[in-house]
Amino acid sequence: DIVVWLYYREMNVVKLGFSNPHRDIYFSSKGHDAPGLYAVLFSLGIIPEELFLKLRRLGGLHGHPDVINHGIEAKSGSLGMGISKGRCITWAKKYLRLPGRVFVVTGDGEFQEGQNFEALQGAAHLSQDRLMVILDHNKIQSDKLVNEIIDLGDLETKFSSFGWHVERCDGNDFQAIERTFTKIGRIKHRPKIIIADTIKGKGVSFMEHPNAIKENGIYKWHDGAPDD
């Protein structure tokens, strides 16, 4: 839902094109969500059908995004690197006097990585108000509940203490997403983060949390293709 909103309503990249230096830039720090991005790019005619239908197959789309494919702005690797990348791209745009915003989606499990907090400090110090982070707060990481691995605590207070403007919304509700982006668009001189409370697998009955949590507490659909 968040990626659909960004490409269809929020960003200028579809209008300007991926080679235009004035474009808004989006990428996900948690690259395992690439199929969702591929679906949006396919719907926009950016990824061809023959490639879209070969996810994780030889000659097809990779399980994590790769810049060899049109429309992919950044690769993903070790978790926790996305905000740092976003900081650098935002700084480069300012240095080159180019317009355009930078949007980064992160996972909640990623915030067990310390690099995120280094990036939060740096972005606030530089008042990078064109950097917008969306935290996909679905409370599941890889195959377990986040709070069973490391409880993240009060995220709003943590982000605010680093100097970020923080908003929270239902990340599966387009009207809530619209209101939140409208609000943060007015904020100047501070980077922004949206804590988007989402339900993993929303809308697909057998994938939707908590239906897909097995008896051993493992979430089944972190990767792989549906079997229903």
Predicted stretch roles:
Residues 38-40, 115-117, 143-147, 179, ...:
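Short acidic, glycine/serine/threonine-rich loops at helix termini
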Residues 174-228:
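Glycine/aspartate-rich loop-and-adjacent alpha/beta segment that forms the canonical ThDP
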Residues 97-100, 147-180:
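Conserved thiamine diphosphate
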Residues 113-138, 193-195:
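A short alpha/beta connector and helix-capping loop motif
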Residues 24-26, 100-104, 131, 190-198:
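Generic beta-sheet signal
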Residues 1-126:
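Cofactor-binding active-site loop characterized by glycine-rich and histidine/acidic residues
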Residues 131-144, 156-163:
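Active-site pocket-lining segment
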Residues 44, 148-151, 208-214:
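Short secondary-structure boundary/capping segments
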